[in-house]
Structures are given as structure tokens and as C-alpha cells.
Amino acid sequence: MENVNQAEFWQQRYEQDSIGWDMGQVSPPLKAYIDQLPESAKEQAILVPGAGNAYEVGYLHEQGFTNVTLVDFAPAPIAAFAERYPNFPVEHLICADFFELSPEQYQFDWVLEQTFFCAINPSRRDEYVQQMAALLKPNGKLIGLLFDKDFGREEPPFGGTKAEYQQHFEQHFDIEIMEPSYNSHPPRQGSELFIKMRVKA
């Protein structure tokens, strides 16, 4: 398995434009979720980890969300995002390893998951869940999409099943929604689960 745990792996992918899973737009289910949020949500602390080209971060910014943090450990997509959104607060663009973020320094009301879970080595999925729970404030939420298929491959994206995901998340989260997405991007119809879960007290 290629070393997806290293920033160099992802930096090279972006430099070579070898990011076949990139949709080039905001994911429709996540756009729909964002669009129904109340005005009061626009000041909440939101994390988008492993954001890549960060279309969702850009959309949140355009809609007036003022406390969104983008994290990726490849410099290339962060630099590209900063070029596209010169008014985005630079202190919220973090080039770092998600697993090394300090919960003492960072706490979020909710996290948006979009093709990050599928990019990490599957052996780190429990570690992902633990770190995600640690970075969320009490009653914090994890919102997003997970692939609902096994790609049977040794490189990202790495898929899985609903039953497998439940086993990973149930220890630290109350799963409110983990169901097939009805409004996925056409090429992903039938292969995504929409998730909404709340960190356990």
C-alpha cells in the first residue's frame, strides 16, 4: 500500500493532478445540508479536515460562515485555495496532519467529512474516530459522506460498508443518520452514505 500517511504522497498527487475522486464542485448532499442551516450556525466553529481543493470550504465562506477551518497536510491545495479566496482568513488555513491537531488548541461545533475518511489508511480508522471525538465540543456533530462500497484496491479512495462504519463510530458517537444519500453527484449515485452523528458525552 502506498504511503498515504505522508504529506509528500498527497503533494505529488496534487502536483500531477492525479486526484480522480475530485468532483470539481461542492458535493450536492453537503450543499443541501449547508443551505438549510439557520443564520445562527454561521458563527459556529467548523472544521473541514483533509479538505483538498476544499469546494465546501469555499461555499461556506461564500455563504457568510465566518469560523471555518481548513486542514490539509499537502501545501498545494491550501495554496490554490488561498489564491481563489484571498479574503479567507489565513489563520484558518492550516497545513498540518489532522492526527496531530491538539484538542487543547482546537475545538469545533461540527466537522464536515468529505473524502477524508476514505483517503486515510484503513488501519487508522479507529484513530480517526478518536481524534474526531476529541476535537469536537460537547454535543458536537460530524456531518458528511462516506463511500458505501468496497473498492477492493490498495490505494485511495478506500471504501467500506455501513456495518463496518458503525463498528468504528459507535464507541464515541451517537449515530443519528447513516443512510444512502438520495442526492449524490450523478457518478456517485448509489455509492454514498450521508452521515450525521453526535459525539457522546
Residue ranges and their predicted role:
Residues 1-48, 52-105, 120-201:
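Class I (Rossmann-like) S-adenosyl-L-methionine-dependent methyltransferase catalytic domain
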Residues 112:
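A conserved beta-strand element that flanks and buttresses the S-adenosyl-L-methionine
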Residues 115-119:
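Short catalytic micro-motifs in class I SAM-dependent methyltransferases
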